[in-house]
Curated annotation (Swiss-Prot):
This is Apolipoprotein A-V. Residues 1-20 form the signal peptide. Belongs to the apolipoprotein A1/A4/E family. GO terms for biological process: acylglycerol homeostasis; cholesterol efflux; cholesterol metabolic process; lipoprotein metabolic process; phospholipid efflux. Keywords: Chylomicron, Coiled coil, Endosome, Golgi apparatus, HDL, Lipid transport, Phosphoprotein, Secreted, Signal, Transport, VLDL. Residues 71-90 are annotated as: Disordered. Phosphorylated by FAM20C in the extracellular medium.
Length: 367
């Protein structure tokens, strides 16, 4: 609840303009009357039905424009309601100072939660790193094997290429056969590594769920959704990576087969293929496959970093003074920023509702 309160105060201070804040405090002072009334309202909040309260909030927050408009200055809307303090400006200033003091006291707890969640997510990244390292090692190893298995340079090979049309054509047809055979074998060898990566993601993300639960500011339901979403996204990305590796191998097979077929056709027309050129072409195609696959694995690693950083912001937002505190919200008049803010407000509502519900149950259980 501490982090939830701090996040609420942070949203107010970070996203409302000075005029909007003034309107909010005018509205607060006009509707509060006196401290006893505020206390009664707070006590009543514990007995409100969550559904009706959420419906009311959603009606007020139907879009961000209306929300900010409602927080605008209310002093020009007609008669002054009863119970208005004699010095609303002074009351507003006092409330702002008190809230700033409360936020300053709560921010260390929020920073600690952000750090604890970050450490756990960093642990997830460390646990998944061996899978990607192993995958890159396998790519390098299989490329080296293919290069050895598809060699066409040697004294016997040169003699065969120069021995006549039939000999050269036979050698290139044999190369085609070896290309299909060995690339197919490599494709099969990559399946277990892809399966291990997917299994590892599921297992380590579940471990993350258990380790991050004590530190997350989010409600238990939202925590479960965030973790499940992270697991699903990483699993889909791992499966997509495996599909791209298979696609790369299929493309390599087609390119090498087409090259060998073209060489065999040239041999039938009387051209003598150059063994050195054939070997260089095979090597270049294999290195291109290795390079492209390494880039795709690196992209997958960056995706893990990006997804875990997003989860950290969702589960334990940093304090307002932190450099990572909602930088995307600082763009004025941005529809994307407003949409993200609306989503954050929905998350905040769920966390507050969950906390109030828990507090209400504990209050009822007291003797």
């Amino acid at each position: 609840m501490v982090a939830v309160l701090t996040w609420a105060l942070a949203l107010l201070s970070a996203f409302a303009t000075v005029q909007t804040q003034k309107g909010f405090w005018d509205y607060f002072s006009q509707s509060s009357g006196d401290k006893s009334k505020v206390a009664r309202v707070q006590q009543q909040k514990l007995t409100w039905e969550p559904t009706s309260l959420k419906d009311s909030l959603e009606q007020d927050l139907s879009n961000m424009d209306k929300f900010l408009e409602k927080l605008g200055p209310l002093s020009g809307q007609g008669r002054e309601p009863p119970g208005l303090p004699h010095d609303p400006e002074g009351m507003r200033q006092q409330l702002q100072e008190e809230l700033a003091e409360v936020r300053a006291r709560l921010e260390p707890y929020m920073a600690e939660a952000h750090q604890q969640v970050g450490w756990n997510l960093e642990g997830l990244r460390r646990q998944l790193k061996p899978y990607t390292v192993e995958l890159m090692e396998q790519v390098a190893r299989r490329v080296q094997e293919l290069q050895e298995q598809l060699r066409v340079v040697g004294e016997g090979t040169k003699a065969q290429l120069l021995g006549g049309v039939d000999e050269a054509r036979g050698l290139l047809q044999e190369l085609q056969t070896r290309v299909v055979q060995h690339t197919g074998r490599v494709r099969e060898l990559f399946h277990p590594y892809a399966q291990r990566l997917v299994t590892g993601i599921g297992r380590h993300v579940q471990e993350l769920h258990r380790s991050v639960a004590p530190h997350a500011a989010a409600s238990s339901a939202r925590l479960s959704r965030c973790v499940q979403t992270l697991s699903r996204k990483l699993t889909l990305k791992a499966e997509a990576l495996h599909a791209r590796i298979q696609q790369n191998l299929g493309q390599l097979r087609e390119e090498l087969s087409a090259f060998a077929s073209a060489g065999a056709g040239g041999a039938e027309e009387g051209a003598n293929p150059d063994a050195q050129m054939l070997s260089q072409e095979v090597r270049q195609r294999l290195q291109a496959f290795r390079h492209d696959t390494f880039l795709q694995i690196a992209d997958f690693t960056r995706a893990i970093d990006q997804e875990t950083e997003e989860v950290q912001l969702q589960l334990a937002p940093p304090p307002p003074g932190h450099s990572a505190f909602a930088p995307e919200f600082l763009q004025a008049d941005s529809s994307e920023a407003r949409s993200k803010l609306q989503a954050r407000l929905e998350d905040l509502w769920e966390d507050i509702n969950d906390s109030l519900h828990d507090r209400g149950l504990s209050h009822l259980e007291e003797p």
